[in-house]
Amino acid sequence: MVNIRPDETSSIILGQTAQYDQEVGVFSTGTVLQVGDGIARIHGPDGVTAGELVESEDGTVGIALNSEPDNAGAVSMGDGSTIQEGSSVKATGKIAQIPVSDAYLGRVANAPAQPTDGKGRIAASEPRLTESPAPGIISRRSVYEPMQTGLIATDPMIPTGRGQRELIIGDRQTGKTAVAIDTTPNQRGQNVICVYVAIGQKASPAAQVVSTFEERGAMEYTVAVAETANPPATSQYLAPYTGAALAEYFMYRKRHTLIIYDDPSKQAQAYRQMSLLPRRPPGREAHPGDVPHLHPRPPERAAKLSSQPGEGSTTASPTVETQAGDVSAYIPTNVTSTTDGQIFLSADLSNAGVRPATNVGISASRVGPAAQIKATKQVAGKSKSELAQFAEPEASAQFASDPDKATRNQSARGQRSRELLKQSQPAPLPVEEQVATTHAGASGFSDVSEIGQVQGSPAQSREYLVTNKPEPAEIVRPTKTFTERAETILKEAIKEHTESFSLKKQI
């Protein structure tokens, strides 16, 4: 007769129950009807929303773009080669999110925030949505702190404040990325975290930017998010949102961040590809009708926070490529309308050897002057006005055989001022040296020199001031003002250097 032991049976059942690790979940699933070019048309799942993540049975994740009565169109975030007709797909009920932490500093990641630099995994402290609401009006405060770029052509005349959105716009090969790259090393010691987002570029230029950051010691406070032209269009579309999420992580921890989007026009091309393949209705230049909503979302999250959220800030600097200087094209105007100003780089100035090729007349900064220090305000106004008015006499002088004296003087002053704004790369200037150089041009101290003598002399003049006449810098640096004593000493120093420079030329 079988001997039944109830206590032993109970212990076996309890042990097996404790080891049971299967979970029961309710998911809305669907079936792939058609797949190709990274686009899947799915029958079901019920209730899927636009922007929701969907997952195939092999683990490939995609984003639902179209939600129609009987099917949904989704774009794959991978190569999509393993997805076949008849495959099962489930709705996750989530939107895209990434891991974030301080460990991302000094690293290179892709749109899903996975490392791509071969230095191992990145320890994450928390997840963050790639698309989150921008700070509200109550959470913001007016821009009042300067974001120094170290460029004499921008800081005095087109100033940028922390929390501002300043566009860098220009034709191909005019130095847009160079301006952004030069700004990053200048943030050393300023408690600023930099986020560089490369969108749809070739792999070699993106790698060169990262290498430049490493050479200048800027990578220790920089995060690079790179999605080159090879990955799927979905990754290029998501890259700016990943960068914005990383910048927000630091901003809400009372840090100041600078995020560079290079460049949103490539994101628009990727979004156009994503939209045309699922047969969404095309609009102007074949872009979908909601492309004006595409570009404002990442820059709008830039802000200067008020005291309650911690007074952190995110400064956004998108770069956009124009064709033949056409700033009124569709994508450039979309991005321009979302920013607080623009730094316009001219192809004509670039071809003439002016670096950086900033066109002061077209460039503007709407909220930046409120963040400018007093010393820079005191000296910059006159120089900006002269450079903005210089284009007209310069153009007329090319056709006039004998221009009048006033036109000749104005043209000569403009040429000298332009020479003073030339700056080699990389050579960021501290504020006090920018003030001295700008004041020298605005006050006419360089008028006694021939234009040929002005070429190369600004760097020598700054070196002379630092070595022999440090008093003006010692006044400007702590007080942020340009006093009469500083002006007097600076005038004497420039006069001495000009005389010695002219003497050397004669010898």
UniProtKB/Swiss-Prot annotation:
Bilayer topology term = Peripheral membrane protein
Q: What class of enzyme is it?
A: translocase
Q: Does the keyword Transport apply?
A: yes
Q: Which cysteines are joined by disulfide bonds?
A: none
Its domain of life? Eukaryota
Keyword list, A-Z: ATP synthesis, ATP-binding, CF(1), Chloroplast, Hydrogen ion transport, Ion transport, Membrane, Nucleotide-binding, Plastid, Thylakoid, Translocase, Transport
One Gene Ontology cellular component annotation held by this UniProt entry: chloroplast thylakoid membrane
Give the site residues for Required for activity. Answer: S363
Q: Which family does it belong to?
A: Belongs to the ATPase alpha/beta chains family.
Q: How does it assemble?
A: F-type ATPases have 2 components, CF(1) - the catalytic core - and CF(0) - the membrane proton channel. CF(1) has five subunits: alpha(3), beta(3), gamma(1), delta(1), epsilon(1). CF(0) has four main subunits: a, b, b' and c.
Q: What is this protein identified as?
A: ATP synthase subunit alpha, chloroplastic
